[in-house]
Amino acid sequence: MARPLSPLDFLLAVLLVAAVVLLLARPHGHRAQAVLADPARTPGVLNPDVTQANIRSTICRHGWTATIRPPVSYTNDLKRRQMRLYGETGSLSDYQEDHLISLELGGNPTDPRNLWPEPYPRAAEMDRTENELNAQVCSGQLTLAQAQQREDTIKHTQG
């Protein structure tokens, strides 16, 4: 049978557990909750080259977004500026400069009104949502406008 803990051993165990809890609960450079896209700063802007009539040659064509994606030098500079505007103080690497209306759904690639700093891991979760909405548009389950509206609502209300 195990011997009972001495008062000192008990105190050390409690302190160790408290330290672990504090370390795990500590935010890592950004708020614990999602950064919502501010409708005033980031209302979302569409790419005029993408329409319902041409989705087969644009957003539904494999690899198309790579042809319009802005360079990292542009998005990192914008991310730095927008993080200050959004009051975010974490490391740049903790955020993705995300498109409110994604490239996969016909969002403008470079307009700052379509981009904002979204923290990880939420940014990665939203990438999956963007891909799912794109698949629904390309399969005819949703119109382009319906998918864009859903994405706008999600990012302005859920992060």
Feature locations, PLM:
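Nuclease and nuclease-like effector domains acting on nucleic acids or nucleotide cofactors
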Residues: 1-95, 105-159
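Short active-site segment of divalent metal-dependent hydrolases/proteases
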Residues: 102
